[in-house]
A protein has these predicted regions:
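Early extracytoplasmic/lumenal segment of secretory-pathway proteins
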Residues: 1-41, 164
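A structural signal for short loop-to-beta-strand junctions that line the ligand-binding cleft
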Residues: 27-32, 50-87, 104, 113-114
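Ligand-binding "clamshell"
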Residues: 43-51, 70-72, 184-196
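Periplasmic-binding protein-like
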Residues: 61-62, 81, 114-118, 145-150, 156, 225-246, ...
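A bilobed periplasmic-binding-protein/Venus flytrap-type ligand-binding module shared by bacterial periplasmic
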Residues: 86-91, 202-217, 234-235
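Ligand-binding pocket segment of bilobal, Venus flytrap-like solute-binding proteins
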Residues: 132-196
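C-terminal capping/gating helix-and-loop segments adjacent to ligand/active sites or protein-protein/ligand interfaces
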Residues: 238-244, 248, 253-281
């Protein structure tokens, strides 16, 4: 689409929601895109998303046990997203630390001053990560584990991308991240690793048309393109490394790249309750 210019405005998820809400009476935004499905439930509940169901073929109904698209048709999944931990191999070696495998590992006192996370009040993906822990372990046990993990933090970043930046640079050794932060850092050549812990979930990253979008036709074309084979393949770019929702795209993925359509263990432990998460947003 060489004649269509796309302007992207990057905001924290919470700030993006607030912006759409505050400008709804004179809306100038066509699309909202985020990794956290609960954010779309907030906008849908406010009547700020327009229905659109793409006719692009090849996209299954589910990724893991979670619907790829909103059953009511207000937003569309274009990538899958899991949550876990990334680490800097050089940092861990220099500090004689093991790579973590489960959330509880990050509560070990050996990691004191060596870990980081972004603020869940400012990052939609971090909110979802904490919510996953609460839903997977139960509210009381989950918060207990999260508090013990937080006791080891060297820093809490204001933006979610501050965590991979800190791990990649060696400012701290281990960070709690959405999967594509770790996978894209690996793809870009940083000396890092990434793991999905057992208690994690798998949900779609979504995109939706805003109510009264000034360029509604082109907004729908953009969603369609994201779902085409060409659009899905872009997700495999080393600087992006998101999980496509078209299973056929994985034939072009690098070796050892996660494939949720073949590895049923990714996100199997937690069936994410988006309404519960929305209520605690």
């Amino acid at each position: 689409y060489p004649n269509i210019t796309v302007e992207v405005v990057g905001k924290k998820t919470t700030a993006g929601i607030k912006y759409i809400q505050e400008t709804s009476s004179n809306n100038g935004t066509d699309l909202f895109c985020a990794s956290a499905p609960d954010a779309f439930e907030v906008l849908k509940g406010d009547g700020l998303l327009a229905k659109y169901s793409s006719k692009v073929k090849g996209i299954p109904k589910l990724v893991g046990s979670y619907p790829i698209n909103d059953p009511e048709g207000f937003y569309t999944g274009f990538a899958a997203a899991g949550y876990g931990m990334m680490w800097n191999n050089r940092y861990l070696k220099a500090n004689n630390l093991p790579a973590p495998k489960e959330w509880i590992d990050m509560a070990d006192p050996i990691y004191f001053g060596h870990t980081g996370m972004s603020a869940p009040s400012r990052s939609g993906t971090t909110h979802l990560t904490v919510e996953t822990l609460l839903q997977g372990d139960g509210f009381v046990k989950g918060w207990g584990k999260m508090k013990n993990i937080a006791a080891n933090f060297k820093t809490v970043t204001a933006r979610s991308f501050g965590v991979p930046d800190g791990v990649n640079s060696g400012d701290f050794g281990v960070g709690i991240v959405i999967d594509f932060f770790g996978l894209s850092s690996i793809g870009s050549g940083f000396p890092v690793g990434f793991v999905y812990p057992t208690v994690t979930t798998l949900v779609p990253a979504n995109i939706g048309v805003i109510t009264n979008a000034p360029n509604e036709k082109n907004a729908k074309l953009f969603i369609d393109f994201l779902l085409t084979p060409e659009g899905q393949e872009i997700l495999l770019d080393p600087k992006i490394r998101r999980l496509p929702v078209n299973p056929k795209t994985y034939s072009k993925a690098p070796k050892d790249f996660p494939n949720p359509f073949k590895d049923s263990s990714i996100g199997a432990a937690v069936k994410f309750d988006v309404q519960l998460s929305k209520g605690r947003y």
